[in-house]
From Swiss-Prot:
GO terms for molecular function: ATP binding; ATP hydrolysis activity. Involved in regulation of DNA replication. It comes from the Archaea. The gene is orc5. Disruption phenotype: Not essential for normal growth. Gene3D superfamilies: 1.10.8.60, P-loop containing nucleotide triphosphate hydrolases, Winged helix-like DNA-binding domain superfamily/Winged helix DNA-binding domain. Belongs to the CDC6/cdc18 family. CDD domains: AAA, Cdc6_C, HLD_clamp_RarA. NCBIfam families: orc1/cdc6 family replication initiation protein. This is ORC1-type DNA replication protein 5. ATP binds at T62, G63, K64, S65, L66, Y219, R231. InterPro entries: AAA+_ATPase (IPR003593), AAA_16 (IPR041664), Cdc6_C (IPR015163), Cdc6_lid (IPR055237), ORC1/CDC6 (IPR050311), Orc1/Cdc6_arc (IPR014277), P-loop_NTPase (IPR027417), WH-like_DNA-bd_sf (IPR036388). Keywords: ATP-binding, DNA replication, Nucleotide-binding, Plasmid. GO terms for biological process: DNA replication.
Length: 428
């Protein structure tokens, strides 16, 4: 039976170690310049004027969502005190595959915020109708609005040679006020890890979006430690052993200064202590939490991939795992040949070599692989070399939840033969 054992928990305010919790300005570390920029850019909203669009870019876990969230929350409260309705429509684009899905997600977000049904089905109607519903909801419930599009660079769309879905979305949203689709003031904030994001959008979208740039660098080790210190009161006063904070900071520093990972690890260690009935959080809880986070993260990322991206990942991992010579790197020509074999085995659509390489390169943004451009020597041309950051066999196992790929998993001997034949041909 369930019972209230809150007094036994190592936490007193667990929300403080939830990465999406909007925290007080006093707890923000190392982001004074970025905070001042966002405040300055959004301040016109309070005077009824249109703020500029913004591009917040920098590595993962560097405070982009934190800063934009903290400032927009303040604006919501200030507008509310004046009887004005400021809407914050925020979506994460990572799990969204198409423009149509993105527009529906925006509709759902607004509807949820104002407590009504979306009023349009997810499928069976045009994207244009979904845009219309989005604009109607905003006009009815908000006086001004900001769209926050997190991880926007991952909203690519399905057609490899078409304008990216994120480019089309930015074009429509950034001009919605000028076209009178939205009656109030509109601002768009795009958040991305990609410093070259603007190079890939259509000229019309670039002109319409025309953002103010705000760069977020990695946190250094001292800043990571201070971020954790500022959330230490999430735990009971004597619940942390002395080695917990330094170890969490060290793990986070290894992840290139990712504060989100540091906070996830901090919280996970506390959760493990609670689950095991311990009154203090120790080093072993931190290490176990780190192992679980690595596994959970890759599982979630892989589960969210499209079937074609799963096939690309599976084929590439198979080269690293099935090679008769121990190797962790995969030449793209070999990976593509194995990809072709896999698609034939499961009767799936077959993408071009360029699309295959593009899909595997995308996996580097998730931290699953790293990429390097290499040469085959004089006259041999260039190719991409993919190196797995985790165990390739584990990646394969995590992909085979796609039922069609399970069939390939049963053909272990044939898969090994195909991989090694292609490697021999490449190396000749």
């Amino acid at each position: 039976m369930l019972h209230d054992d809150g007094d036994a928990s190592v936490f007193v305010n667990r929300d403080l170690v939830e990465p999406d919790t909007i925290i007080d300005e006093e707890r923000i570390v190392g982001r004074d310049e970025q905070l001042e920029s966002v405040v300055s850019f959004l301040k016109p909203t309070l005077q009824g004027n249109r703020p500029p669009n913004m591009l917040l870019y920098g590595p993962a876990g560097t405070g982009k969502s934190l800063i934009i969230g903290a400032v927009t929350q303040q604006i919501i409260e200030l507008c509310h005190s004046k009887g004005e309705r400021f809407g914050v429509v925020q979506v994460n684009c990572q799990p969204i595959n198409t423009l149509d899905q993105a527009v529906y997600e925006l509709v759902q977000t607004v509807a949820s915020d104002v407590g009504i049904e979306p009023g349009v089905p997810e499928t069976g109607v045009s994207t244009k109708r979904k845009y219309r519903r989005l604009y109607d909801l905003i006009n009815e419930h908000y006086d001004s609005v900001i769209f926050i599009l997190d991880e926007i660079d991952l909203l690519v769309g399905r057609r490899a040679n078409d304008e990216p879905a994120y480019s089309k979305l930015l074009y429509q949203l950034s001009r919605a006020s000028n076209t009178n689709d939205i009656e109030g003031q509109v601002s768009v904030a795009a958040l991305t890890n990609d410093p070259k994001f603007m190079e890939n959008i259509d000229g019309r979208a670039e002109s319409s979006f025309n953002p103010r740039d705000i760069y977020f660098p990695d946190y250094d080790a001292t800043q990571l430690r201070q971020i954790l210190e500022n959330r230490r009161d999430a735990f009971r006063q004597d619940a942390l052993t002395d080695d917990v904070l330094p170890l969490v900071s060290a793990f986070a520093a290894q992840s290139h200064g990712d504060a989100r990972k540091a906070i996830d690890l901090f919280r996970g260690a506390g959760d493990l202590a609670d689950e095991q009935g311990d009154q203090t959080v120790r080093e072993d809880h931190v290490r176990e939490s780190q192992d679980e986070i690595d596994k959970d993260r890759s599982l979630k990322l892989i589960a969210g991939l499209t079937t074609q991206k799963k096939i690309s990942l599976y084929a590439t991992a198979a080269v690293a795992h099935c090679s008769s010579a121990t190797r962790n790197s995969v030449p793209s020509p070999v990976g593509f040949q194995v990809y072709q074999w896999v698609t034939e085995e499961i009767d799936a659509d077959q993408m071009t070599r360029e699309t295959y390489v593009k899909y595997v390169k995308e996996l580097s943004t998730y931290g699953l692989v790293s990429t390097a451009r290499k040469s085959r020597g004089r006259g041999g041309g260039m190719y991409m070399d993919f190196t797995f950051r985790g165990d390739p066999e584990s990646m394969m196992h995590r992909v085979v939840d796609d039922t069609r790929l399970e069939r390939v998993g049963t053909e272990s001997e044939r898969l090994h033969a195909v991989v090694n034949a292609q490697l021999r041909e490449f190396e000749e």
